[in-house]
Amino acid sequence: LSNPPFSLKNWGREVAEANSYNRFNYGVAPASYGDLAFVQHMLASLNSKGVLATVVPHGILFRGGEEGKIRQAMLEDDLFEAVIGFPQNLFYGAGIPASVIILRKNKSEDKKGKVLFIEASQGFVKDGNKNKLREEDIANIISAYESFEDKEKYAKVVDIEDIRKNDYNLNITRYVDTSEEEEEIDIEEVLGRISER
């Protein structure tokens, strides 16, 4: 479990390009965003049954270029097990929304070829100028992760094929629909009320 610095600039790309320790097998992260460099370093440190969970900025879920290629390669190797979206303003020094990604080197058969998305960004309480997860928010996240099944407006299990069709974009709202159904408006009724005035 880790919380590396968000979008670290000048993280040491020039050293990583040599890749003498085979830490960056999925590609070298861009010089201006070190997020996936940290993720790959952690991944390379795992044994064959290892699991990692790390806090990342949302940008790594959808940015293109080198990050998109790294994300694609990691998805094709079936490493992503879950992507959990958290509220903005949760961490000191970072007002942007964050996610936790869970990568597993040896997924169980029932999870192979699938990624669980959890949209937990609305579960919090204001605490001064920060947002804070309550016990029930944490319990909901754990329950959704452990059950690894769809939960309306909260969690969705998505096949890798669907992620491929979305250009390997892992933006949570692309998969978990949290929109509220809009009330239908009867135009005839509204026009009738207007004409009565």
Each model region followed by its residue ranges:
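A conserved structural/catalytic subdomain of Rossmann-like adenosyl-cofactor enzymes
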Residues: 1-197
